[in-house]
Amino acid sequence: MKVRILNEPINVELSRIAADKSISHRCAIFSLLSDKPSHVRNYLKAGDTLNTLDIVRTLGAQIQERGEEVIITPPEKILEPDVVLECGNSGTSMRLFMGLLAAQDGFFVLSGDKYLNRRPMARVAKPLVAVGAKIDGANEANTAPLCIRGKKLERFKYDSPVASAQVKSALLLAALYSNGCEFSEPELSRDHTERMLKGMGAKIKTQGASIALEPMSTPLAPLDIDVPNDPSSAFFFAVAACIIPNSHIVLKNVLLNETRIEAYKILQKMGADIKFKEISGKYESIGDIEIRYAALNAVEVSENISWLIDEAPALAIAFANAKGTSVLKNAKELRVKECDRIAVTVAGLKKCGIKARELEDGFEVSGSDASCAIIDSHGDHRIAMSFAVLGLKCGMIIEKSEFIATSFPNFVSILRKIGASVED
């Protein structure tokens, strides 16, 4: 993909951004917790979430599409499949299904593409095994394919050493089908699972970063939901408005969950003019985000990292356009995402002439003028999109840009809508 320099301000209202990926995954998986059809409007039809929907179908659900609505009718009982459950490039799918299937009667095999099958899964497998699940795979169940022999678990208490929505969600799903649990983490991670379970009628109590969950004695209520726009996807265009002088963007109908808008608040700390307007929300807070261009200043970021881990590469682009040297710390998880996002982000910035260096758990970036470069995305959709945004300032050629479709299939069309010249 080739992005040319944008020589004019961005002035646009965006309403058709990618639907939220985290919510879409959960809508598909959590529909299995009910005995009635779930109605999901604006489901994200991207590679990762379509794989999740395919797995739900393989486990026995019937899926109908009526325009923008997906209707998911769950089976009476989750089926034992006679095929491998393919998660594609989605770590979220694999880790959440690990928890769900760990408590089901049957034998299940989860696998993914060559990139996902290299990513570490022990961070979820080990906690599940510690509470009684039977999971096996290569490298002591650290890499897929993963084999799961499901069974009902005893009630458990688990204090997670890391704040991770995927660890938390996997354990809660396993506990829901078993005998319940008590769970805690060092700080609150994304809380979509707790909110959606509560909205469906699960007996769940939350206090800060602690959760008490009772087992599911009867099926939960079905979902009836309009999936909001994804703040992580929308963030690329927030950064674009912050680095292209005199720009003004309104991002419509965006998920405003506090655990998902931390990156926007970092931009505010850097001097960005950003306003939030809450409008509605059944399971979650939803509204609009308005961004006007303002000069950015350097910042140090070391808290609530689990709330902005997906936005870190795009945040690095904002750092590169700020006055001074910015630092991101306590983000070691970036090294085990779709690629080593610390190393790849820093290498890409250096190729563009930006002074940047790796830290063990983050990166340091000094703002300066960037130059056009050829960037290898390493098959990481967020790396590709982040450097596409930087390309609006200096031009950019991005290799393996096809992976953008795993989360944001209309990203290029929105780039063109804001005035960019893009060659696929």
UniProtKB/Swiss-Prot annotation:
Binding-site residues, phosphoenolpyruvate: K21, G91, R119, Q166, R341, R382
- Tell me yes or no: is Secreted among this UniProt entry's keywords: no
Which SUPFAM superfamilies does the UniProt entry name for this protein?
EPT/RTPC-like
Q: Which GO terms describe its cellular component?
A: cytoplasm
The record's section on InterPro entries has: Enolpyruvate_Tfrase_dom, Enolpyruvate_Tfrase_sf, EPSP_synthase, EPSP_synthase_CS, RNA3'P_cycl/enolpyr_Trfase_a/b
Positions bound to 3-phosphoshikimate: K21, S22, R26, S164, Q166, D310, K337
Give the Gene3D superfamilies listed for this entry: Enolpyruvate transferase domain
Per the UniProt record, one Pfam family is EPSP_synthase
Gene Ontology molecular function: any one:
3-phosphoshikimate 1-carboxyvinyltransferase activity
Q: Show the catalytic activity.
A: 3-phosphoshikimate + phosphoenolpyruvate = 5-O-(1-carboxyvinyl)-3-phosphoshikimate + phosphate
Swiss-Prot/TrEMBL GO biological process terms? amino acid biosynthetic process; aromatic amino acid family biosynthetic process; chorismate biosynthetic process
- Might you give the EC number(s) for this enzyme? 2.5.1.19
> Where does the record place the catalytic residues?
D310
| Cellular localisation | Cytoplasm
Q: Which domain of life is it from?
A: Bacteria
Q: Which UniProt keywords apply?
A: Amino-acid biosynthesis, Aromatic amino acid biosynthesis, Cytoplasm, Transferase
Q: In which pathway does it act?
A: Metabolic intermediate biosynthesis; chorismate biosynthesis; chorismate from D-erythrose 4-phosphate and phosphoenolpyruvate: step 6/7
As for what it does, the entry says: Catalyzes the transfer of the enolpyruvyl moiety of phosphoenolpyruvate (PEP) to the 5-hydroxyl of shikimate-3-phosphate (S3P) to produce enolpyruvyl shikimate-3-phosphate and inorganic phosphate.
The subunit field of the Swiss-Prot or TrEMBL record says: Monomer.
Q: Which family does it belong to?
A: Belongs to the EPSP synthase family.
- Protein name according to UniProt: 3-phosphoshikimate 1-carboxyvinyltransferase
Annotated organism of origin: Campylobacter curvus (strain 525.92)
